[in-house]
């Protein structure tokens, strides 16, 4: 873990590093060695030096002019062909992807997203978060995936995004019924292959078809099943994204 972090910080050369309070000791040593002098903490309980510093900031927001081709994020790949590579994503990449998916997936006023994905991955960090953000939607934020908690929260939501294993675990919950998903309109899966058995059981159990999509760290979303169609398992024919 420390070796990976040393590589990421050294490669990205960030001006600021934010970590959990319990990891401050070893993370700050790596950051200082790499030349990053600003290391702040942010805890799950909404405490930490980042918020302490923010409390003393001016209420005036100063906009920084940005072009579409300006770098917005460096997202590190899983490293399947060697060491993780930093995928350089621009502001134009992020904005166009969010705009296209908002239209294509039918985001609308009143939508509520259940977010139970890790935010170190493009699915949770950009696709889910930016979808809710650009639509101005409420988000039910879960720090980790808990199938029982997700089932309890389903009646409050309209959109859920997950990887196939999350759907398998939800299907193991007796509380997953058509009544529980009565307000849901969209279930999305990606990041790994969705088995046809899971696809069919989900549709039979809930009355909803899981919408499959495909993307990667370097491009965000590339293709997606149509939203307003009775799609087949494994069909991802239409190119989408930015």
Please report, for each region that a protein language model flagged, where it lies by residue.
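Structural core segment of the AMP-binding/adenylate-forming
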Residues: 1-53, 65
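Short secondary-structure boundary segments
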Residues: 20-22, 43, 144, 164-165, ...
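Conserved AMP-binding/adenylation subdomain of ANL enzymes
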Residues: 95-112, 120-159, 173, 227
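Gly/Ser/Thr-rich phosphate-binding loop
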Residues: 154-162, 171-239
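Conserved pre-ATP/AMP-binding loop-to-beta segment of ANL
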Residues: 57-76, 82-83, 106-112
């Amino acid at each position: 873990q420390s070796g990976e972090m040393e590589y990421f910080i050294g490669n990205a050369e960030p001006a600021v590093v934010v970590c959990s309070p319990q990891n401050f000791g070893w993370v700050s040593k790596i950051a200082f060695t790499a030349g990053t002098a600003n290391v702040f903490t942010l805890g799950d309980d909404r405490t930490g030096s980042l918020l302490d510093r923010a409390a003393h900031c001016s209420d005036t927001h100063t906009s920084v002019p940005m072009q579409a081709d300006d770098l917005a994020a460096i997202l590190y790949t899983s490293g399947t062909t060697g060491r993780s590579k930093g995928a350089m994503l621009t502001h134009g990449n992020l904005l166009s992807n969010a705009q296209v998916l908002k239209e294509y997936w039918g985001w609308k006023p009143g939508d509520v997203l259940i977010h139970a994905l890790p935010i170190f991955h493009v699915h949770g960090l950009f696709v889910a978060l930016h979808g809710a953000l650009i639509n101005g939607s409420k988000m039910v934020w879960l720090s980790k995936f808990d199938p029982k908690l997700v089932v309890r929260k389903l009646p409050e939501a309209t959109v859920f995004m997950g990887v196939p294993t999350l759907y398998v675990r939800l299907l193991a919950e007796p509380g997953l019924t058509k009544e529980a998903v009565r307000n849901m309109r969209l279930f999305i899966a990606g990041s790994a292959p969705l088995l046809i058995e899971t696809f069919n059981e989900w549709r039979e159990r809930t009355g909803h078809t899981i919408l499959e999509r495909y993307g990667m760290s370097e491009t965000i979303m590339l293709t997606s099943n149509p939203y307003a169609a009775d799609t087949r398992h494994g069909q991802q024919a239409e190119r989408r994204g930015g």
